[in-house]
Curated annotation (Swiss-Prot):
The gene is frsA. This is Esterase FrsA. Residues 19-39 are annotated as: Disordered. It is an enzyme of class 3 (hydrolase). Keywords: Hydrolase, Serine esterase.
Length: 416
């Protein structure tokens, strides 16, 4: 896309779009969640609607100074906000608006990519743009038109990056029962020869496929494993489907289609679940044990948060809004949402607690509101070959890296 056209389409002020935090109408309880900090979600403070997820953004490759620069522009804006107490609620697509500022930053890197003459540098610049466009769309609330445009830009930039970086990216299309097709990205390492042992990625509810590039680049590819990503229901390429109690519906059909994908060794497939993605992955461990060599989870959300109203009351509004959006319940009462969430518990569904033949690893942090130790233990104790992996909180970045290294080795061991 030419820079002139990019500026015309991206940065023309518009005031017709609803502000992100107003898209889900629920009873707010921010006052009870101040100061919450989670390794995987980031920090919740009284000044922001969104969780500020510096660790994960830096891990994906965004420069820390760049993060602070964008956040400061948002914070300094004098424009009208839907909630004057929350800095990231500037109304309209203009300076100070969350989507506007992050997309503008992404466009800067896109421009650099088009001007660069070095392939490695060009690929990295496109990847930087994809990361920033994804943050612009975060937390990917259904019906957020500006966020959906940013998602499209993120996916385009991600595909452009792959043309220049030392791995192969294939866009795969899978037919879905009931109609429609689903697009997934197969990442293949530059070393080795297809068909590859493959990790099916089950991401968290507020991420895109492109957000897991670092996981492939630094962990799976060096181990000789491919990575297949699929958007969770109601996000990105999966936006036409809402999340149901059959949370693994889309991933299960993709898993069953892998024998027809020549680059994937369908006899050597594992799954990896982040947060709610673990709900999908563990469900697959039960329903498709003959197709999976192992399932690893990090900070899994499979029972306690879904079934405990008191725990839900402590969760930041943004996280509960994301859940309501994914379930297709943006206008529901808190009571009806919490009742529905209880049905997503894999223990309530009669799965967890039963013996599962699939090897499962579950990593957790102490005092994690979304995933207490009991959550991870429930998964591990249900597996015929379970492994519990505690992760120390500090130093945060090093321990996160160490956890991913352990998970990668464990998955590699299952497909060797």
């Amino acid at each position: 896309m030419a820079q002139a056209n990019l500026s015309e389409t991206l940065f023309k002020p518009s005031f017709k779009h609803r502000e992100t935090s107003t898209l889900v109408r629920r009873t707010r309880h921010d006052q009870e969640t101040q100061g919450l900090h989670s390794t995987l979600e980031g920090e919740k403070t009284s000044s922001w609607y969104r969780m500020i997820n510096r660790l994960m953004w830096i891990w994906r490759g965004v420069n820390p100074w760049e993060i602070e620069d964008v956040l400061s522009r948002i914070a300094a804006s004098q424009a009208d906000r839907s909630n004057e107490q929350l800095l990231d609620t500037v109304i309209g697509y203009r300076g100070g608006n969350w989507i506007y500022e992050w997309a503008k930053q992404g466009a800067d890197w896109q421009q650099r990519a088009t001007e660069s003459g070095d392939d490695a540098q060009t690929g990295q610049f496109w990847l930087n743009a994809a990361n920033l466009y994804s943050i612009a769309a975060y937390p990917h609330i259904k019906g957020d038109e500006l966020a959906e445009q940013a998602q499209t830009l993120a996916n385009r930039a991600y595909e452009e990056a792959a043309k220049y970086l030392p791995y192969e990216l294939k866009e795969l299309t899978f037919p879905i029962a009931g109609g429609g097709t689903l697009t997934g990205f197969l990442h293949m390492p530059s070393q080795g020869k297809a068909p590859f042992p493959t990790v099916l990625m089950c991401g968290s509810l507020e991420t895109l496929q492109s957000d897991y590039h670092r996981l492939f680049q630094d962990y799976f590819a060096p181990a000789g494993m491919a990575m297949l990503t699929i958007d969770v229901p109601s996000v990105g390429f999966s936006s036409r489907w809402k999340l149901t109690q059959d949370s693994s519906f889309l991933h299960q059909q993709v898993l069953r289609a892998l024998p027809d994908v020549p680059w994937v060794d369908h006899c050597r497939v594992t799954a990896f679940g982040f947060r709610f993605g673990a709900n999908i992955a563990v469900r697959l461990a039960y329903l498709e044990s003959q197709r999976l060599r192992g399932v690893a989870c990090l900070g899994p959300v499979v029972h306690h948060l879904l079934s405990d109203p008191n725990r839900q009351q402590q969760v930041p509004d943004m996280f509960m809004d994301v859940l309501a959006s994914r379930l297709g319940m943006p206008f529901s009462t808190d009571a009806s949402l919490k009742t529905e969430l209880g049905r997503y518990s894999l223990k309530t569904q009669g799965l967890l607690g039963r013996r599962c033949p699939t090897p499962m690893l579950a990593g957790y942090w102490e005092n994690d509101l979304l995933c207490p130790k009991e959550e991870a233990s429930l998964i591990v104790n249900s597996s015929a070959q379970g492994k519990l992996m505690p992760v120390n909180f500090s130093p945060v970045y090093q321990n996160f890296d160490r956890a991913l290294q352990q998970i990668s080795r464990w998955l590699q061991d299952k497909v060797c």
